[in-house]
Amino acid sequence: MPAAERREMVLEAAVAEFAAHGLAGTSTEDVARQAGISQPYLFRLFPTKKALFLALVERCFRRVEDTFTAAAGDLTGDEAMDAMADSYTRLLDDRTLLLLQMQIYAACSDPEIRDATRAAYKHLWEMIERITGLPFQTVVDFFAIGMLMNVAAAMDLPSVDERWTSWCPKDADDCPKD
């Protein structure tokens, strides 16, 4: 199997491990085992555990960007923003991705991870501004609601109190229900 395919297998295995255990708690031995490779081979693909985690930071933000870009299509303004918001509620159904996002933010005490996360977040922000053309404060509100959605979904608050689904459009079929 080519190294690029093995690298993808490692990233897939690493997503689940890092989402569950975070940067400090994840064992590269466990990632290698889940990927079906040896730990020394893992380190040929990714020289350090941090390098592997940084690849996941990039991958996670790229997935959100790709989702938003596809949702917005040729739309602009509020229509694009609404389409991206709706697509994000569906993206949050992937609990592993959601928990990985939370672990990425938690790992920002490491300067290298913080810099990579900040750069990816900035790129996402600028993309949304470019696509929507909406004012700065509207984009601030979009990100604030998105972060609230992350935290509420991570704690599974919608299953405890239906008021936590109030950010969902009334006709949305894909928002959490009790």
Task: Name what the model sees in each region.
Residues 29, 40:
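Residues within helix-turn-helix
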Residues 79-102, 107-115:
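Helical hydrophobic small-molecule/effector-binding pocket
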Residues 9-16, 20, 34, 44, ...:
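Alpha-helical structural segments
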Residues 17, 91, 127:
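Short alpha-helical functional segments enriched in proximate histidine and acidic residues
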Residues 5-6, 37:
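The short coil/loop that forms the "turn" connecting the two helices of the helix-turn-helix
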Residues 111-123, 128-178:
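Hydrophobic/aromatic-rich alpha-helical bundle segments in the mid-to-C-terminal region
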